[in-house]
């Protein structure tokens, strides 16, 4: 099952990023396969590629955290087997680029990791408890390994702990 993926580019920096739609589809299809998720027949998600200012506003509004982060997920909250709209993933260019550089990882690989991580939140995974975090990270490693991407947790990224929790509430600002 392949969901419909709506892509919105809300920051000029992403204009040079080669084919985000294909990367998103590849990562999400592999994540569905590895997780065994059963989605609604007409499942749909949106991915917003934005800048730090855009995501900082969302982070402040929905999480009460007054700074940018790498990715936010906005799950719709319904059962994934019957809910057509799974939710939204928002990825910030500057933070993602900085983290990739600091970790010595290719930018595209880090974006792939954030797409997988964000999508797992949309289908019900979280990392609030240690056991849940371990299971989620193991699944991310497996997905990325299948795509030929190195283990994203070899070196911890500063924003992974403070920015990847699912967010409750609608993301109306990008669905205009």
From Swiss-Prot:
Record text on cofactor binding: Binds 1 zinc ion.
Recorded superkingdom: Bacteria
Source organism per UniProt: Methylocella silvestris (strain DSM 15510 / CIP 108128 / LMG 27833 / NCIMB 13906 / BL2)
Xref: PROSITE patterns: UPF0054
Protein name listed in UniProt: Endoribonuclease YbeY
Location of the protein in the cell: Cytoplasm
GO molecular function: metalloendopeptidase activity; RNA endonuclease activity; zinc ion binding
Entry function: Single strand-specific metallo-endoribonuclease involved in late-stage 70S ribosome quality control and in maturation of the 3' terminus of the 16S rRNA.
Pfam families xrefs: YbeY (PF02130)
Family statement: Belongs to the endoribonuclease YbeY family.
EC number: 3.1.-.-
One GO process term, biological-process aspect: rRNA processing
Main location: cytoplasm
Keywords noted in UniProt: Cytoplasm, Endonuclease, Hydrolase, Metal-binding, Nuclease, Ribosome biogenesis, rRNA processing, Zinc
Enzyme class: hydrolase
InterPro entries: MetalPrtase_cat_dom_sf_prd, YbeY, YbeY_CS
Protein residues bound to Zn(2+): 117, 121, 127
A GO cellular component entry from the record: cytoplasm
Cofactor(s) annotated in UniProt: Zn(2+)
């Amino acid at each position: 099952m392949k969901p419909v993926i709506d892509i919105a580019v809300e920051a000029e920096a992403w204009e040079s990023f080669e084919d985000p739609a294909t990367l998103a589809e590849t990562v999400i299809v592999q994540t569905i396969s590895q997780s065994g998720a059963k989605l609604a027949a007409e499942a749909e998600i949106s991915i917003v590629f934005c800048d730090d200012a855009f995501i900082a506003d969302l982070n402040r509004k929905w999480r009460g955290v007054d700074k940018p982060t790498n990715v936010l997920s906005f799950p719709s909250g319904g059962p994934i087997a019957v809910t057509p709209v799974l939710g939204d993933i928002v990825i910030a260019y500057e933070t993602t680029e900085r983290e990739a550089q600091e970790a010595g990882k290719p930018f595209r690989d880090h974006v792939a990791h954030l797409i997988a991580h964000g999508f797992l939140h949309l289908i019900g995974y979280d990392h609030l408890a240690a056991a849940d975090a371990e299971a989620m990270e193991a699944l991310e490693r497996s997905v990325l390994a299948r795509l030929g991407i190195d283990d994203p947790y070899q070196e911890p990224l500063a924003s992974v702990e403070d920015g990847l929790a699912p967010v409750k509430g609608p993301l109306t600002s990008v669905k205009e």
